[in-house]
Amino acid sequence: MGLDLPNDNLIRGPLPEAHLDRLVDAVNARVDRGEPKVMLLTGASRGIGHATAKLFSEAGWRIISCARQPFDGERCPWEAGNDDHFQVDLGDHRMLPRAITEVKKRLAGAPLHALVNNAGVSPKTPTGDRMTSLTTSTDTWMRVFHLNLVAPILLAQGLFDELRAASGSIVNVTSIAGSRVHPFAGSAYATSKAALASLTRELAHDYAPHGIRVNAIAPGEIRTDMLSPDAEARVVASIPLRRVGTPDEVAKVIFFLCSDAASYVTGAEVPINGGQHL
């Protein structure tokens, strides 16, 4: 389904403690019944998002996904995938309250064990070149920051109670471009990812007292639609492991950060780049 009606309602604050206690009781009851953990994944239709949904689904998680594209049942053969997917442009900040309402409706009182903010955009010039700070329009700056930074902020705020009830985990997908000038990623993309890394630390500090862990992963060159064969050939020499990564390798780190194995990890940004950052 699509969410095509704008909604400028404010994101409401945390629930009262009494309401939270009822949510926690509901969590315990669901655990006793053996119900699966639940993840919200943005940008789930391809690349890293697709690999992440596949891995979590194979591990028995329920995946609520959203993307600009409709669900592709042939490429995404996980259980209830179509039923738990909705279309939304998270780059339009007016859509965030409505998207949060949609997630809450699908949770139907269930807790949210993981929020993976994977959706992102890295615009190029008409000739495919990187957009610099001199050539990027105001509209492009705003569009990139709304999707790459504002959406993760508002989703974390709007789903705080559901995450708190599950002692959940947030994983933000940043980039190696957030820490250095990148040959392909544009200025707006790079600075939005640097800001997302900073946001990860802020959220980790603010959410830790409530039992919510917040981390980030910073992929380098990963074989996705964003990396052309020509670009791949050009960057391999700068990677100590002498190859690009795969979406599956990134998904495994996301899974670790959402698992009990990472129960004492928060505020970290994990580089996944074959040593390219060295």
UniProtKB/Swiss-Prot annotation:
Family affiliation: Belongs to the short-chain dehydrogenases/reductases (SDR) family.
Organism: Bradyrhizobium diazoefficiens (strain JCM 10833 / BCRC 13528 / IAM 13628 / NBRC 14792 / USDA 110)
Binding site for substrate: S175
Active site as annotated: Y189 (proton acceptor)
PROSITE patterns, alphabetized: ADH_SHORT
A Gene Ontology BP annotation from the UniProt entry: nitrogen fixation
Record-given protein name: Protein FixR
GO terms assigned for molecular function: oxidoreductase activity, acting on the CH-OH group of donors, NAD or NADP as acceptor
Keyword 4Fe-4S: no
InterPro entries: NAD(P)-bd_dom_sf (IPR036291), Sc_DH/Rdtase_CS (IPR020904), SDR_fam (IPR002347)
Gene3D superfamilies associated with the record: NAD(P)-binding Rossmann-like Domain (3.40.50.720)
The UniProt record lists the keyword Flavoprotein: no
Binding site for NAD(+): 40-64
Keywords, ordered alphabetically: Nitrogen fixation, Oxidoreductase
